[in-house]
Amino acid sequence: MATQNPNQPVTYPIFTVRWLAVHTLAVPSVFFVGAIAAMQFIQR
């Protein structure tokens, strides 16, 4: 028990394939939602 430090997880790295997949979808999605929301207020 003394050899396992709970503050240093071994099997959970931060930069994983899941992290990459989430951010490649989330970053453009936030950009497009902001762009579409801004377009709603443009008067012709």
Swiss-Prot record:
Any one annotated GO CC term: photosystem II reaction center
Subcellular localization, per the record? Cellular thylakoid membrane
- Where on this chain does heme bind? R18, H23
Residues in coiled coil: none
The superkingdom listed in its UniProt entry is Bacteria
Q: Which GO terms describe its biological process?
A: photosynthetic electron transport chain
Q: How does it sit in the membrane?
A: Single-pass membrane protein
The note on the cofactor says: With its partner (PsbE) binds heme. PSII binds additional chlorophylls, carotenoids and specific lipids.
Molecular function terms from GO: electron transfer activity; heme binding; identical protein binding; iron ion binding
Asked whether the UniProt record includes Transcription among its keywords, one would answer no
Sorted alphabetically, which InterPro entries does this protein's record hold? PSII_cyt_b559_bsu, PSII_cyt_b559_CS, PSII_cyt_b559_N
What single Pfam family name could you report for this chain, choosing any that match?
A: Cytochrom_B559
Assigned keywords, A-Z: Electron transport, Heme, Iron, Membrane, Metal-binding, Photosynthesis, Photosystem II, Thylakoid, Transmembrane, Transmembrane helix, Transport
Q: Which cofactor does it need?
A: heme b
Q: Which residues cross the membrane?
A: 17-41
Instruction: Kindly state the subunit structure of this protein.
Output: Heterodimer of an alpha subunit and a beta subunit. PSII is composed of 1 copy each of membrane proteins PsbA, PsbB, PsbC, PsbD, PsbE, PsbF, PsbH, PsbI, PsbJ, PsbK, PsbL, PsbM, PsbT, PsbX, PsbY, PsbZ, Psb30/Ycf12, peripheral proteins PsbO, CyanoQ (PsbQ), PsbU, PsbV and a large number of cofactors. It forms dimeric complexes.
Q: Which family does it belong to?
A: Belongs to the PsbE/PsbF family.
Q: Its function?
A: This b-type cytochrome is tightly associated with the reaction center of photosystem II (PSII). PSII is a light-driven water:plastoquinone oxidoreductase that uses light energy to abstract electrons from H(2)O, generating O(2) and a proton gradient subsequently used for ATP formation. It consists of a core antenna complex that captures photons, and an electron transfer chain that converts photonic excitation into a charge separation.
User: What's the protein here called?
Assistant: Cytochrome b559 subunit beta
Protein species of origin:
Synechocystis sp. (strain ATCC 27184 / PCC 6803 / Kazusa)
